[in-house]
């Protein structure tokens, strides 16, 4: 069986420059890449917030053509939080812009984090308010997604700010059930799911069970490894698969059992921002081969 592999470049593209980052991904043997709208949308000088943002996209599309490296998925920015008083704020125009941009680059799947409340969620009623806020917020993006034939992919999260305490409800959108409920309550065929394995591990989830629960809705992957959530330290370290504590064989089996048809995308940070170009290519190539090996073992 032939698999397609892609990688994120968000951890190093600002250091190397976009054209060099894409060239390194191509040199490492990947079929496509995950375009980081999140990187190019932050800051007053970011190209996606400029009036001539479409000229930036034309240059990206030309690079894709020259390198024969398509954009298979993209990552939207996460610029909005739920206000403490829960007053509603519509999606920033930039989110609509990113959907249009994804379509222009030939990218069908744009990944979004659910909008979070950066406070402790100590009751089910508070968690329900967060859910209702997200349903309303994402529903406002549906028409744009329909107009540009793009799918909004909802990514599972984790308690990155260590706000939860023992006895509290699970942090919102860390379970397969939460993700499926958000998808269904938004109520559009423009919504799909993205599984981030590192986030799931940081939330102490059974990752294969999440995959089985998402059958038919799972469209994209953020495959990465870590050593689990450690309070007081940054734990979302995005190692290459196989370099942390996650057990990968059951994950690959689950993906094959549900007949996952999407691209196998890794989202590494690891040491990629710190090494030279040659070493970065080597690490990316090794990560791809390791992933390919994990998949081939399921064919035996």
PLM feature spans:
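Short acidic, glycine/proline-rich loop/turn micro-motifs
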Residues: 44-46, 84-85, 121-124, 163-167, ...
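N-terminal small/glycine-rich loop or linker at the start of catalytic domains
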Residues: 1-8, 72-81, 117-121
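Short, conserved active-site loops that position catalytic residues or coordinate cofactors/metal ions
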Residues: 34-43, 72-78, 114-116
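Active-site acidic/histidine proton-transfer and metal-coordination neighborhood
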Residues: 58, 62-66, 81-192, 202
């Amino acid at each position: 069986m032939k698999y397609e592999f892609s990688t994120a470049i968000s951890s190093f593209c600002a250091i190397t420059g976009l054209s060099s980052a894409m060239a390194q991904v191509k040199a490492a043997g990947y079929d496509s890449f995950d375009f980081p709208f999140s990187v190019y949308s932050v800051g007053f000088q970011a190209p996606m917030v400029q009036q001539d943002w479409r000229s930036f996209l034309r240059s990206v599309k030309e690079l894709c053509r020259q390198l024969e490296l398509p954009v298979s998925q993209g990552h939207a920015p996460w610029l909005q939080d739920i206000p403490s008083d829960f007053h509603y704020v519509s999606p920033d125009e930039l989110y609509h812009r990113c959907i249009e941009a994804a379509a222009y680059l030939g990218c069908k799947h744009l990944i979004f984090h659910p909008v979070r409340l950066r406070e402790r969620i100590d009751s089910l009623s508070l968690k329900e308010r967060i859910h209702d806020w997200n349903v309303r917020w994402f529903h406002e993006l549906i028409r744009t997604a329909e107009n540009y034939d793009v799918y909004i992919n909802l990514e599972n999260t984790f308690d990155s700010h260590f706000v939860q305490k023992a006895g509290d409800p699970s942090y919102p959108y860390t379970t397969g059930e939460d993700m499926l409920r958000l998808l269904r309550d938004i109520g559009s065929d423009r919504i799909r799911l993205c599984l981030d394995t590192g986030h799931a591990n940081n939330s102490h989830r059974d990752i294969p069970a999440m995959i089985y629960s998402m059958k038919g809705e799972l469209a994209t992957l953020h495959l990465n490894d870590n050593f689990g959530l450690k309070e007081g330290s940054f734990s979302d370290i995005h190692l290459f698969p196989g370099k942390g504590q996650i057990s990968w064989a059951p994950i690959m089996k689950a993906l094959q059992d549900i007949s996952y048809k999407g691209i196998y995308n890794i989202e590494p940070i690891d040491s990629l921002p710190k090494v030279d170009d040659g070493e970065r290519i080597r690490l990316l190539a090794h990560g791809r081969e390791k992933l390919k090996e994990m998949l081939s073992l399921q064919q035996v």
